[in-house]
Protein backbone atom coordinates (compact mmCIF):
# COMPACT_ATOMS: atom_id res chain seq x y z
CA UNK A 1 0.00 0.00 0.00
CA UNK A 2 1.29 3.47 -0.83
CA UNK A 3 2.50 5.59 2.08
CA UNK A 4 -0.15 8.24 1.39
CA UNK A 5 -3.02 5.76 1.77
CA UNK A 6 -4.50 5.19 5.23
CA UNK A 7 -7.68 3.24 6.04
CA UNK A 8 -8.48 3.22 2.34
CA UNK A 9 -8.30 7.01 2.00
CA UNK A 10 -5.67 8.74 -0.12
CA UNK A 11 -4.17 11.76 1.66
CA UNK A 12 -4.69 14.85 -0.49
CA UNK A 13 -1.89 17.39 -0.72
CA UNK A 14 -4.24 20.25 -1.55
CA UNK A 15 -5.94 19.73 1.81
CA UNK A 16 -2.61 19.34 3.63
CA UNK A 17 -3.65 15.91 4.91
CA UNK A 18 -1.26 14.03 7.21
CA UNK A 19 -3.16 11.54 9.36
CA UNK A 20 -2.16 11.04 12.99
CA UNK A 21 -1.59 7.33 13.70
CA UNK A 22 0.55 7.11 16.88
CA UNK A 23 -1.68 5.98 19.78
CA UNK A 24 0.70 7.30 22.45
CA UNK A 25 0.69 10.77 20.91
CA UNK A 26 -3.07 10.66 20.34
CA UNK A 27 -3.81 9.85 23.97
CA UNK A 28 -1.29 12.46 25.11
CA UNK A 29 -3.22 15.09 23.15
CA UNK A 30 -6.59 13.91 24.46
CA UNK A 31 -5.29 13.97 28.03
CA UNK A 32 -4.02 17.52 27.48
CA UNK A 33 -7.47 18.54 26.24
CA UNK A 34 -9.17 16.73 29.16
CA UNK A 35 -12.67 16.77 27.63
CA UNK A 36 -15.67 16.91 29.97
CA UNK A 37 -19.19 15.63 29.30
CA UNK A 38 -20.79 19.09 29.04
CA UNK A 39 -18.11 20.61 26.78
CA UNK A 40 -19.08 22.21 23.48
CA UNK A 41 -16.18 20.60 21.63
CA UNK A 42 -15.38 21.43 18.01
CA UNK A 43 -12.69 19.67 15.98
CA UNK A 44 -11.24 21.26 12.85
CA UNK A 45 -10.21 18.77 10.16
CA UNK A 46 -11.04 15.48 11.90
CA UNK A 47 -9.78 13.45 8.95
CA UNK A 48 -10.24 9.76 9.67
CA UNK A 49 -11.15 10.28 13.32
CA UNK A 50 -7.80 9.72 15.07
CA UNK A 51 -8.72 12.30 17.72
CA UNK A 52 -12.47 12.03 17.28
CA UNK A 53 -12.59 8.40 18.45
CA UNK A 54 -10.89 8.88 21.85
CA UNK A 55 -12.68 12.19 22.40
CA UNK A 56 -16.07 10.53 21.91
CA UNK A 57 -15.04 7.89 24.44
CA UNK A 58 -15.15 10.67 27.04
CA UNK A 59 -17.99 12.90 25.86
CA UNK A 60 -21.45 12.06 24.46
CA UNK A 61 -21.25 14.20 21.33
CA UNK A 62 -19.17 16.80 19.51
CA UNK A 63 -18.98 18.83 16.31
CA UNK A 64 -16.44 18.90 13.49
CA UNK A 65 -15.62 21.12 10.51
CA UNK A 66 -14.32 19.15 7.50
CA UNK A 67 -13.58 20.34 3.95
CA UNK A 68 -12.95 16.99 2.22
CA UNK A 69 -16.35 15.81 0.92
CA UNK A 70 -15.31 12.16 0.91
CA UNK A 71 -14.40 12.37 4.58
CA UNK A 72 -17.59 14.27 5.40
CA UNK A 73 -19.72 11.34 4.22
CA UNK A 74 -17.44 8.82 5.88
CA UNK A 75 -17.65 10.64 9.22
CA UNK A 76 -21.44 10.90 9.06
CA UNK A 77 -21.81 7.19 8.37
CA UNK A 78 -19.38 6.19 11.08
CA UNK A 79 -20.55 8.33 14.00
CA UNK A 80 -24.19 9.08 13.25
CA UNK A 81 -25.96 11.45 15.63
CA UNK A 82 -23.04 11.63 18.06
CA UNK A 83 -21.10 13.76 15.58
CA UNK A 84 -22.47 16.91 13.97
CA UNK A 85 -20.47 17.39 10.78
CA UNK A 86 -20.20 20.86 9.25
CA UNK A 87 -19.02 20.53 5.66
CA UNK A 88 -16.92 23.50 4.65
CA UNK A 89 -13.71 25.48 4.87
CA UNK A 90 -12.65 26.39 8.42
CA UNK A 91 -11.05 29.56 7.01
CA UNK A 92 -14.52 30.84 6.09
CA UNK A 93 -16.51 29.18 8.88
CA UNK A 94 -18.54 31.24 11.36
CA UNK A 95 -17.66 29.65 14.70
CA UNK A 96 -19.94 32.10 16.53
CA UNK A 97 -22.96 30.10 15.37
CA UNK A 98 -21.76 27.10 17.41
CA UNK A 99 -21.55 29.06 20.65
CA UNK A 100 -23.93 28.19 23.48
CA UNK A 101 -24.69 30.79 26.21
CA UNK A 102 -22.61 30.02 29.28
CA UNK A 103 -20.70 27.23 27.53
CA UNK A 104 -17.76 28.61 25.53
CA UNK A 105 -16.32 26.56 22.71
CA UNK A 106 -13.37 24.22 23.06
CA UNK A 107 -11.69 23.98 19.66
CA UNK A 108 -9.16 21.28 18.75
CA UNK A 109 -7.51 19.96 15.64
CA UNK A 110 -4.57 18.67 13.66
CA UNK A 111 -4.43 21.75 11.44
CA UNK A 112 -3.23 21.67 7.82
CA UNK A 113 0.17 23.32 7.97
CA UNK A 114 -0.35 25.21 4.71
CA UNK A 115 -3.17 27.30 6.21
CA UNK A 116 -2.24 27.36 9.90
CA UNK A 117 -1.35 31.06 10.24
CA UNK A 118 -4.40 32.40 8.35
CA UNK A 119 -6.62 30.04 10.33
CA UNK A 120 -5.18 31.18 13.66
CA UNK A 121 -5.91 34.79 12.72
CA UNK A 122 -9.43 33.85 11.57
CA UNK A 123 -10.12 32.18 14.91
CA UNK A 124 -9.12 35.35 16.77
CA UNK A 125 -12.39 36.87 15.59
CA UNK A 126 -14.29 34.33 17.73
CA UNK A 127 -12.05 34.33 20.82
CA UNK A 128 -14.73 35.87 23.03
CA UNK A 129 -16.77 32.67 22.59
CA UNK A 130 -13.86 30.26 23.12
CA UNK A 131 -12.65 28.64 26.35
CA UNK A 132 -9.49 27.14 24.88
CA UNK A 133 -7.87 25.76 21.75
CA UNK A 134 -5.52 22.77 21.35
CA UNK A 135 -3.85 22.50 17.96
CA UNK A 136 -1.28 20.32 16.27
CA UNK A 137 0.95 22.58 14.19
CA UNK A 138 4.37 22.67 12.61
CA UNK A 139 6.81 22.87 15.53
CA UNK A 140 8.46 25.96 14.08
CA UNK A 141 5.09 27.75 14.11
CA UNK A 142 4.45 26.81 17.75
CA UNK A 143 7.91 28.09 18.69
CA UNK A 144 7.13 31.38 16.96
CA UNK A 145 3.77 31.64 18.73
CA UNK A 146 5.24 31.34 22.24
CA UNK A 147 8.59 33.07 21.54
CA UNK A 148 9.97 35.72 23.88
CA UNK A 149 11.38 39.09 22.77
CA UNK A 150 15.05 38.88 21.83
CA UNK A 151 14.80 35.43 20.25
CA UNK A 152 15.02 34.73 16.52
CA UNK A 153 11.58 33.11 16.60
CA UNK A 154 9.92 36.26 17.98
CA UNK A 155 7.95 38.10 15.31
CA UNK A 156 4.58 39.29 14.06
CA UNK A 157 2.82 35.99 14.82
CA UNK A 158 4.17 36.01 18.40
CA UNK A 159 2.93 39.54 19.08
CA UNK A 160 -0.49 39.32 17.47
CA UNK A 161 -1.38 36.06 19.23
CA UNK A 162 0.16 36.86 22.63
CA UNK A 163 -1.98 40.00 22.84
CA UNK A 164 -5.13 37.83 22.67
CA UNK A 165 -4.08 34.47 24.17
CA UNK A 166 -2.11 32.82 26.92
CA UNK A 167 -0.22 30.06 25.07
CA UNK A 168 1.69 26.97 26.11
CA UNK A 169 3.85 24.52 24.13
CA UNK A 170 2.34 21.22 25.31
CA UNK A 171 4.23 18.42 23.55
CA UNK A 172 6.39 17.61 20.52
CA UNK A 173 5.32 15.17 17.81
CA UNK A 174 7.81 13.46 15.44
CA UNK A 175 7.10 12.93 11.72
CA UNK A 176 6.71 9.18 12.27
CA UNK A 177 3.48 9.78 14.20
CA UNK A 178 1.73 10.55 10.89
CA UNK A 179 0.80 8.77 7.68
CA UNK A 180 2.16 10.02 5.35
CA UNK A 181 4.94 11.49 7.53
CA UNK A 182 5.47 15.23 7.02
CA UNK A 183 8.94 16.60 6.31
CA UNK A 184 8.93 18.68 9.50
CA UNK A 185 8.53 18.15 13.24
CA UNK A 186 5.19 19.01 14.80
CA UNK A 187 4.00 20.20 18.20
CA UNK A 188 0.81 20.75 20.17
CA UNK A 189 -0.04 24.19 21.54
CA UNK A 190 -2.65 25.21 24.10
CA UNK A 191 -4.27 28.63 23.54
CA UNK A 192 -6.47 30.26 26.19
CA UNK A 193 -8.09 33.59 25.26
CA UNK A 194 -7.56 36.37 27.78
CA UNK A 195 -10.96 37.09 29.39
CA UNK A 196 -12.54 40.53 29.47
CA UNK A 197 -13.39 42.98 32.24
CA UNK A 198 -17.01 44.03 32.65
CA UNK A 199 -16.29 47.12 30.54
CA UNK A 200 -15.01 44.98 27.65
CA UNK A 201 -11.29 45.52 28.17
CA UNK A 202 -9.06 42.44 27.92
CA UNK A 203 -7.63 41.04 31.16
CA UNK A 204 -4.30 40.67 29.42
CA UNK A 205 -0.74 41.37 30.63
CA UNK A 206 -0.78 43.94 27.83
CA UNK A 207 -3.09 46.94 27.47
CA UNK A 208 -5.94 46.62 25.00
CA UNK A 209 -5.52 48.27 21.61
CA UNK A 210 -6.89 48.48 18.09
CA UNK A 211 -5.82 45.12 16.64
CA UNK A 212 -5.80 46.48 13.09
CA UNK A 213 -3.43 49.31 13.99
CA UNK A 214 -1.24 46.88 15.94
CA UNK A 215 -1.05 44.62 12.89
CA UNK A 216 0.03 47.51 10.68
CA UNK A 217 2.69 48.64 13.17
CA UNK A 218 4.13 45.16 13.66
CA UNK A 219 4.15 44.41 9.93
CA UNK A 220 6.11 47.61 9.29
CA UNK A 221 8.51 46.92 12.17
CA UNK A 222 9.39 43.45 10.93
CA UNK A 223 9.57 44.38 7.23
CA UNK A 224 13.37 44.61 7.55
CA UNK A 225 14.34 42.39 10.47
CA UNK A 226 18.08 43.05 10.23
CA UNK A 227 17.73 46.82 10.45
CA UNK A 228 16.91 48.92 13.49
CA UNK A 229 13.45 50.39 13.88
CA UNK A 230 14.67 53.85 12.93
CA UNK A 231 14.63 52.52 9.36
CA UNK A 232 11.15 51.00 9.50
CA UNK A 233 9.07 53.11 11.91
CA UNK A 234 10.49 56.62 11.48
CA UNK A 235 7.60 57.44 9.13
CA UNK A 236 5.42 57.56 12.25
CA UNK A 237 7.35 60.44 13.87
CA UNK A 238 4.70 62.96 12.79
CA UNK A 239 2.04 60.95 14.65
CA UNK A 240 3.78 59.92 17.85
CA UNK A 241 6.62 61.22 20.03
CA UNK A 242 8.86 58.17 20.40
CA UNK A 243 11.18 59.94 22.86
CA UNK A 244 8.32 60.98 25.14
CA UNK A 245 7.01 57.42 25.36
CA UNK A 246 10.50 55.97 25.85
CA UNK A 247 10.36 53.91 22.67
CA UNK A 248 13.96 53.31 21.53
CA UNK A 249 14.17 53.24 17.73
CA UNK A 250 17.76 52.02 17.96
CA UNK A 251 16.56 48.47 18.59
CA UNK A 252 15.68 45.74 16.14
CA UNK A 253 12.06 44.66 15.87
CA UNK A 254 12.55 41.37 17.73
CA UNK A 255 14.03 43.19 20.75
CA UNK A 256 10.86 45.15 21.56
CA UNK A 257 8.46 43.63 24.15
CA UNK A 258 4.84 43.03 23.19
CA UNK A 259 3.64 45.70 25.61
CA UNK A 260 5.62 48.43 23.86
CA UNK A 261 4.11 47.57 20.49
CA UNK A 262 0.67 47.64 22.10
CA UNK A 263 1.31 51.06 23.66
CA UNK A 264 2.51 52.39 20.30
CA UNK A 265 -0.66 51.09 18.65
CA UNK A 266 -2.78 52.72 21.37
CA UNK A 267 -1.18 56.10 20.77
CA UNK A 268 -1.72 55.73 17.04
CA UNK A 269 -5.15 54.15 17.01
CA UNK A 270 -7.10 55.26 20.07
CA UNK A 271 -9.76 52.90 21.39
CA UNK A 272 -9.82 49.17 20.51
CA UNK A 273 -11.74 48.27 17.38
CA UNK A 274 -11.49 46.19 14.22
CA UNK A 275 -11.44 42.49 13.46
CA UNK A 276 -8.42 40.28 14.00
CA UNK A 277 -8.48 39.03 10.44
CA UNK A 278 -7.68 42.51 9.20
CA UNK A 279 -4.36 42.30 10.97
CA UNK A 280 -3.31 39.13 9.21
Swiss-Prot record:
Its main location: cytoplasm. One of its GO terms (cellular component) is cytosol. The keyword Cytoplasm applies. GO terms for molecular function: 16S rRNA (adenine(1518)-N(6)/adenine(1519)-N(6))-dimethyltransferase activity; RNA binding. It is found in: Cytoplasm. Its EC number is 2.1.1.182. Keywords: Cytoplasm, Methyltransferase, RNA-binding, rRNA processing, S-adenosyl-L-methionine, Transferase. The keyword RNA-binding applies. InterPro entries: KsgA/Erm, rRNA_Ade_diMease-like_C, rRNA_Ade_Mease_Trfase_CS, rRNA_Ade_methylase_Trfase_N, rRNA_adenine_dimethylase, SAM-dependent_MTases_sf. S-adenosyl-L-methionine binds at residues 18, 20, 45, 66, 89, 110. NCBIfam families: ksgA. PANTHER family: DIMETHYLADENOSINE TRANSFERASE (PTHR11727), DIMETHYLADENOSINE TRANSFERASE-RELATED (PTHR11727:SF7). Belongs to the class I-like SAM-binding methyltransferase superfamily. rRNA adenine N(6)-methyltransferase family. RsmA subfamily. Specifically dimethylates two adjacent adenosines (A1518 and A1519) in the loop of a conserved hairpin near the 3'-end of 16S rRNA in the 30S particle. May play a critical role in biogenesis of 30S subunits. This is Ribosomal RNA small subunit methyltransferase A. It comes from Cupriavidus necator (strain ATCC 17699 / DSM 428 / KCTC 22496 / NCIMB 10442 / H16 / Stanier 337). The gene is rsmA.
Amino acid sequence: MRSNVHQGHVARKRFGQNFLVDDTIIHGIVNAISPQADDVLVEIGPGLGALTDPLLERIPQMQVVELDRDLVERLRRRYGERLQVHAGDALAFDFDKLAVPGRPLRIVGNLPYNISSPLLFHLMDFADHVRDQHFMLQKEVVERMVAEPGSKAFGRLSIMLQVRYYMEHVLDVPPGAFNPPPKVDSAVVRMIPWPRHSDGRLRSPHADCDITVLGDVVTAAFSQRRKVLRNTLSFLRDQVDFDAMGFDLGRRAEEVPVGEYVELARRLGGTPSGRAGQAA
